[in-house]
């Protein structure tokens, strides 16, 4: 995959549909090779820096395991482990790390930080999550969808995202639909729709590739005929408590539950979630939500749906590692 060598991976629209498909094919091959014991290390001797301004379970573990599988070594720089943007400029950090490492992963805040790292590092930079985009998650999602509907092309699939679509997940889903021709439906209150300019750009590209993008507040209309229903958390521990009540009131009708799944009219519909999910009362935040807002048995998704046979969330989680491995192999090996 010489066309990817030394490229950055910052957002999906930096690539063509053919390039995205190549990454997915590589991920599927690497996954099969690992499971059959035939994986060949392509990154032996490579050193990789993992910058995490925001903590993560899946992203960190995915990058570390993928790197180790491929013979690379990693250095983890956590929220308190680097001076990026505080005592040292992003530009200077990029130039320092670029002299020591072969690739840099960034998970943190503004997209402009990842772009500045990419501009000055001189080595591939990969976006593990920014406020605006989460491209590695969408790679995993697309691979998972292919695995569960192997007889369908993306432009024959319908993906529903229910809940708060004005975040990095909503933005990256728009970009994924633009490149693949998915029938993407963002089912959300209008206050939670993505920026109109990105919607317009991605809708035009999606239509060129045989798909469409729909934004609607109507749950029944939005989920009809869906192959996949996707959601994400409504609130996080870092948000002010006053925001919780406001967000829950806004999104309560968009909870993924058995009724929503049935409204699809598709007995084979699958449930997706990028995790972590507040589907029960077994976490600190989940318990608080249950006590203060009566959300027993789940917030953005009910425990019933999360634990059902329709749920493929742990296939998604595993595929984070395989798709991230594909990105590293494609950009670091000739």
Swiss-Prot record:
A biological process (GO) of this protein is: L-arginine biosynthetic process
Residues where L-ornithine binds: 168, 232, 236-237
**Superkingdom, according to UniProt?**
Bacteria
Q: What's its EC? A: 2.1.3.3
Sites where the protein binds carbamoyl phosphate = 56-59, 83, 107, 134-137, 274-275, 320
The reaction(s) annotated as catalysed by this protein in its Swiss-Prot or TrEMBL entry are: carbamoyl phosphate + L-ornithine = L-citrulline + phosphate + H(+)
Q: Which SUPFAM superfamilies match?
A: Aspartate/ornithine carbamoyltransferase
Q: Does the keyword DNA repair apply?
A: no
Where does it reside? Cytoplasm
Gene Ontology cellular component?
Answer: cytoplasm
Major subcellular location class: cytoplasm
* UniProt keyword list: Amino-acid biosynthesis, Arginine biosynthesis, Cytoplasm, Transferase
Q: Could you cite one Gene Ontology molecular function of this protein?
A: ornithine carbamoyltransferase activity
Q: In which pathway does it act?
A: Amino-acid biosynthesis; L-arginine biosynthesis; L-arginine from L-ornithine and carbamoyl phosphate: step 1/3
Q: What does this protein do?
A: Reversibly catalyzes the transfer of the carbamoyl group from carbamoyl phosphate (CP) to the N(epsilon) atom of ornithine (ORN) to produce L-citrulline.
Family of this protein: Belongs to the aspartate/ornithine carbamoyltransferase superfamily. OTCase family.
Which PANTHER family is this protein grouped with? ORNITHINE CARBAMOYLTRANSFERASE SUBUNIT F-RELATED, ORNITHINE CARBAMOYLTRANSFERASE, MITOCHONDRIAL
Q: What is this protein called?
A: Ornithine carbamoyltransferase
């Amino acid at each position: 995959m010489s066309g990817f060598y030394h490229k950055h991976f910052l957002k999906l629209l930096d690539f063509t549909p053919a390039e995205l498909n190549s990454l997915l094919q590589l991920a599927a091959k690497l996954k099969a090779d690992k499971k059959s014991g035939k994986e060949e290390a392509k990154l032996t001797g490579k050193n990789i820096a993992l910058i995490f301004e925001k903590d993560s379970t899946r992203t960190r573990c995915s990058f570390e395991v993928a790197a180790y599988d491929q013979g690379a070594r990693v250095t983890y720089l956590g929220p308190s482990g680097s001076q990026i943007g505080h005592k040292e400029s992003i530009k200077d950090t990029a130039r320092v790390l670029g002299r020591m490492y072969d690739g840099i992963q960034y998970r943190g805040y503004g997209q402009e930080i990842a772009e500045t790292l990419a501009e000055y590092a001189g080595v591939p930079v990969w976006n593990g999550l920014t406020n605006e985009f989460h491209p590695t998650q969408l790679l995993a999602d697309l691979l998972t969808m292919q695995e569960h509907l192997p007889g369908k092309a993306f432009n024959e699939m319908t993906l529903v995202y229910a809940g708060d679509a004005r975040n990095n997940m909503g933005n990256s889903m728009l970009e994924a639909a633009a490149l693949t021709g998915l029938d993407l439906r963002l089912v959300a209150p209008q206050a939670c729709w993505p920026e109109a300019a990105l919607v317009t750009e991605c809708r035009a590209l999606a239509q060129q590739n045989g798909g469409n993008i729909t934004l609607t507040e109507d749950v029944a209309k939005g989920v009809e005929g869906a192959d996949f229903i996707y959601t994400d958390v409504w609130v996080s521990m870092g948000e002010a408590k006053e925001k919780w009540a406001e967000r829950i009131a806004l999104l309560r009708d968009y909870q993924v539950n058995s009724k929503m799944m049935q409204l699809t009219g598709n007995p084979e519909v699958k449930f997706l979630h990028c995790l972590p999910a507040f589907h029960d009362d077994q976490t600190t935040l989940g318990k608080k939500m249950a006590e203060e807002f009566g959300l027993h048995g789940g917030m953005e998704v009910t425990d019933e749906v999360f634990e059902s046979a329709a749920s493929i969330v742990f296939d998604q989680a595993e595929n984070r590692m395989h798709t991230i491995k594909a990105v590293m192999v494609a950009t670091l090996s000739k």
